[in-house]
Amino acid sequence: RMGALLAMRRLERPEIAQFLHDEDSLLVTEAARAINDVPIQAATRDLANLTDDKNLSEPAWRRVVNANFRLGREEYAQQLGAIAVNESIEANIRVEALQALADWGSPSGRDRVTGIWSPLAGYRSIEDARRAVQSAMPQLADHRFQNLTSALIDAVQAVKLETASAWLLGTLRNDELSDSTRSDALEALAQLAESALVNEAVQFALEKGSKKLQREALRWQAQSADSLQAIKFALEGEDIQGQQAAIASLARDTTQEAMDLTGKLMTQLVSEELSGALSLDVIELVEER
């Protein structure tokens, strides 16, 4: 049977899809490789629809995910969502399904598995991916697996799923997650949510977050007297990254007090009283003014 499969691969025969249902997992994997890697486009739908087989190898699963991504229609976005929530599938494959949904609206010209240049043709609706992510949210929202949570944040942000704002805030508040994951949640929230919710998230991060979260919060802090006070506090600290974030935040503040603070930083730069690590940040700040 392997000989027949390899012959079909060489001839690029769509009948190779029959091996996707073989009892020998090695043959199933080789058929999936042939359909995706050659590629044998006439059999791509057969590969994409292999989502009910729980015994697939990781290489086969990666190609199933890729087939659904490449076909690019609503039903295939939904199948990626189904893979993402299927707990019988390895977490890294579920993450890959979410990443595919995140990339749905702006696919790379290279194949996700082989890296070969193979640009996708035809219209792809980001709304299809948005609906798939929204359908998957209830089963992925419990933060049990941090890599899935991170991938879900990326997908939510990419498809602009505004209804996930409350979940993003809850993710930010979850101190069992890594700073990186919580920081990503804050960034996504800042780009999706209404200002009141963003302000609540920023205030939480500034008051109770780690230095990394505080730096991220400074980036999204709304213009106010309190925000300028937070910027000054960060500039007086010893955390270089925090100071850089404060300078970047200062660029968005158009008040006279912010202008005065910019002038003070420039004076420190000229008189060499400013840390060399901040010189470029201050120069860029002045140029933006």
Task: Name every feature range the model reports, one short phrase each.
Residues R1-R13, Q18-F19, V28-I40, N49, ...:
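Structural detector for internal amphipathic alpha-helices that build alpha-solenoid repeat scaffolds
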Residues R13, T44, A77, A129-Q134, ...:
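Core helices of alpha-solenoid repeat scaffolds
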Residues R110:
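Short acidic/His/Gly/Ser-rich catalytic and metal-binding motifs that mark active-site loops
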Residues A136-Q139:
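Amphipathic alpha-helices of TPR/Sel1-like and other helical repeat/solenoid scaffolds
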